[in-house]
Design a protein with these regions (language model features):
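Acidic, polar-rich low-complexity tracts and alpha-helical solenoid repeat scaffolds
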Residues: 16-284
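Sec-dependent bacterial lipoprotein signal peptides
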Residues: 1-16
Length: 284
């Protein structure tokens, strides 16, 4: 009997707790509704500020939207409201809308002291939309472009080191994507396409720490392509491999991979000799 009473007591307490939470939620909704219905715009602005400071960004956003028309003639107040409104979107993770709002802020308040910050945050919003390397990198490319514009526009900014780091990070992501695409061609046996893709990768990222690896993959790709070609084309394609090997030696004389490149040079040279000898034998 005692256990039954304990169960009833806990059930009652749980019910009270749920009821209290529901009441608080309804109260919050009613409170926001009352604020929006008010004709006291200074009060509305204070409440929006309170929501913003306490990180209730959805509510702050709604109130800011409501008071925009009233404060448009008060330049200083309107700038402050627009600034915080843009950050509401950013802080809610709505980076696409935030980027547009940061850009719009700069266009609306071109002489604002916050323009530099907004310019950076616009570029940073593109960066926040940048996906993993396997996916479409449109936003990554936009992040690089807008960060570079920021650096050029604000050469004395304290944010430039961070901007450069972001550009480097985004370029590294593009490099990974291009490498995986080139490697996929190679793994699928599409060796000519792989050679072209690895060459493009090397041209796009000549300062990469893996540049010698990419060049070796160019050599490997064209070597395999030559081996699979019809006999009439093999000499010319092995000659291309030799040219790539010589470029490797010129560009990466200290590379630990130079031995492999020289081995492909030797193999290609020998293959050309064999092909030439066979042609001599078959010539009447």
């Amino acid at each position: 009997m005692k256990s039954v009473w304990i169960f009833i007591l806990f059930a009652a307490l749980a019910g009270c707790g749920s009821s209290k939470k529901a009441t608080q939620r309804n109260s919050g909704k009613k409170s926001l509704a009352r604020i929006l219905k008010s004709h006291d715009y200074e009060y509305k602005r204070r409440m929006a500020e309170q929501f913003f400071v306490t990180k209730k960004y959805i509510k702050a956003q709604q109130v800011y939207e409501d008071i925009f028309p009233y404060y448009k003639t008060d330049r200083a107040a309107f700038e402050d409201i627009y600034y915080k409104y843009a950050y509401c979107a950013y802080n809610m993770g709505d980076y696409m809308n935030a980027e547009n709002l940061f850009k719009s802020f700069m266009e609306t308040f071109p002489s604002s002291k916050k323009s530099e910050e907004m310019d950076y945050m616009r570029a940073y919003s593109f960066y926040k939309q940048s996906p993993k390397p396997e996916l479409d990198q449109t936003q990554t490319i936009k992040a690089i472009g807008t960060m570079q514009v920021f650096i050029n526009t604000h050469p004395g900014s304290s944010r430039i080191p961070d901007a450069n780091k972001i550009i480097d990070e985004c370029r590294a992501k593009l490099e990974v994507k291009d490498f995986k695409s080139a490697l996929l061609y190679y793994d699928m046996g599409q060796f000519r396409a792989a050679g072209v893709a690895f060459t493009s990768l090397l041209n796009s990222f000549p300062e990469s720490q893996k540049a010698d690896e990419y060049k070796l993959m160019v050599i490997k790709s064209y070597f395999k392509y030559a081996g699979l070609s019809i006999e009439e084309k093999q000499v010319e394609r092995y000659e291309q491999v030799i040219a790539e090997c010589n470029e490797f030696s010129d560009q990466f004389p200290e590379s630990k991979l130079i031995g492999e490149a020289q081995e492909y040079l030797k193999l290609s040279t020998n293959n050309i000799k064999k092909l030439s000898n066979e042609q001599i034998k078959t010539t009447p």
